[in-house]
Amino acid sequence: MKIDRENKVYTIAFTFIITFAFVIVLSLINNATEPTVKKNQELLKVKAILNAMDISYLSDDEALDKFRNDVQKVENDKYEIYKTTSGGEEIYALIFSGSGLWGTITGVLAVDSSLSTIKGIDFISQSETPGLGGRIEENWFKDQFRDEKVADGMVSVSVTKTDGSKEDGKVDAVTGATLTSK
C-alpha cells in the first residue's frame, strides 16, 4: 500500500507526530538539565551577593564556602536580605528587581549598617540589549556605586555626566539605555 503524501490527512498526521516527538525530546532534556540549571542560578546569586559585599573569591567552590561561612540570611518576610561583617562593620545586601527595557533586572545592593553608604552592587540576571542596557554588567558601571553616599534616602541615576562625587547620591547612566539605568 502506497501512502499518498499529497493528502491533507497525511500532512496533518505527519506534522502532529513530528511535533509530538520533538516535544517529548525537549521535555526529557529539560527534566534532565533542571538540577544543573538551578545549581548554576544559585551560584550566580551567591557570586552576586559576594561581589556586592566586596568579598573576593577565586573559584566557584571558594565562593560557595565563603557564602556559607561568612554570610547569614536575615529573617524578613518582605525582602531577601543577607548580612556579613567586614573589618568590624556590618554590611547588608538586599536582593532587588525592577523593570528594564526587555525584561526584569534582578540584582543585589549592599549597604553599610547605617544605610547611608552603598558598599556595592551586582546583577543576578538581566536581558537588556548587549552594548546598551547590557552594559550594567560592566565594572565601570558597578564600580561607581561603591562608597556612594545615599542622599535623601535614595540613590538617583543621572542621565547626564556627573562630577564623580561620592557625596551627591548620583551615578552616571548608561548612554543610550536610559530606561535600563533607572
Ranges and model annotations:
Residues K2-K182:
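Flexible, solvent-exposed loop/hinge segments and secondary-structure transition points
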